[in-house]
């Protein structure tokens, strides 16, 4: 558990036929994060986690898939740095689910 840290969390819902694209997005974003983000200091990325699985509604599978991204940073400076890096280099994170 991370106390007094800053977190970003995103959720995408998509059709199962886009599963390979979702996996590629996760791999590309993870590679970019590992190449550009520090693991120490005020801007530290403390955790990066992806989860992919079926979407549920009222306890039943909908037929769709869900992709969840969680990023935990030491503080707000890490989040600000994250978005600055993405904006300044045309980050490899994109929305291919359309």
Question: Which sequence ranges carry the predicted segments?
Answer:
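Short, flexible turn/loop "capping" segments at secondary-structure junctions
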Residues: 1-6, 60-63
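Active-site-flanking beta-strand signature of metal-NTP-handling nucleotidyl enzymes
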Residues: 5-15, 68-70
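Short acidic-aromatic low-complexity motifs
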Residues: 15-20, 35-39
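Short amphipathic alpha-helices within nucleic acid-binding modules
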Residues: 20-24, 75-85
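Structured segments of extracytoplasmic/periplasmic soluble domains
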Residues: 28-36, 85-86
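Short, glycine- and small/hydrophobic-rich beta-strand elements in well-ordered beta-sheets
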Residues: 33-68, 97-98
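Outer-membrane beta-barrel domain signature
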Residues: 87-98
């Amino acid at each position: 558990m991370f106390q007094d840290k800053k977190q970003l969390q995103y959720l995408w819902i998509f059709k199962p036929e886009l599963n390979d694209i979702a996996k590629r997005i996760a791999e590309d974003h993870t590679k970019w994060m590992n190449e550009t983000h520090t693991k120490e200091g005020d801007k530290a990325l403390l955790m990066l986690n992806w989860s992919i699985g079926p979407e549920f509604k009222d306890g039943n599978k909908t037929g769709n898939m869900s992709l969840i991204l969680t990023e935990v940073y030491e503080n707000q400076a890490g989040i600000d740095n994250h978005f600055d890096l993405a904006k300044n280099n045309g980050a490899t994170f994109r929305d291919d689910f359309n």
